[in-house]
């Protein structure tokens, strides 16, 4: 018998920005015997990651390139704005947020969630790229040659 997760749990943004923080904060609060204020040095990563995800999603919608995520195929290939720096700025926002979560709470559980999601998002990107290549062909090949998959100018 297979059970499907509820739709709200299958949603990547809900997992990244709601479920994982609740799990990490709850786990660390129980492990430490009470809530501790997170390390302020890494809180900007949380804000950066979340805002990157949200603002790039809005940018994508406003430039008629589909909805946030690949719930629907983009109507056109965005190659400007944040997409001129990295091919996956929204997914990168998720990962920056999760890294900030792990570091803010010095959480091994948070680090584990981050590592698992690095692998998951990378596999998801490979799948997305195959779909996008099928839709845009040589235009996407040229874009791939110019723009890195994850970290601008590096990776």
For each predicted feature, which ranges?
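Membrane-anchoring alpha-helices and their flanking helix-loop junctions
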Residues: 1-80, 92-155
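Histidine-centered phosphotransfer motif of kinases
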Residues: 85-89
């Amino acid at each position: 018998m297979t059970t499907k997760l509820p739709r709200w749990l299958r949603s990547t943004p809900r997992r990244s920005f709601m479920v994982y923080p609740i799990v990490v904060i709850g786990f660390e609060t129980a492990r430490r015997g009470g809530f501790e204020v997170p390390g302020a040095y890494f809180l900007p990563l949380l804000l950066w990651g979340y805002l990157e995800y949200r603002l790039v999603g809005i940018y994508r919608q406003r430039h008629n390139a589909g909805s946030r995520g690949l719930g629907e195929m983009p109507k056109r290939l965005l190659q400007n704005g944040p997409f001129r720096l990295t091919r996956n700025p929204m997914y990168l926002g998720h990962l920056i947020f999760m890294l900030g979560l792990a570091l803010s709470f010095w959480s091994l559980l948070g680090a584990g969630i981050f590592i698992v999601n690095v692998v998951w998002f990378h596999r998801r990107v490979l799948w997305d790229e195959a779909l996008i290549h099928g839709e845009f062909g040589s235009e996407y090949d040229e874009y791939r040659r110019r723009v890195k998959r994850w970290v601008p100018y590096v990776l």
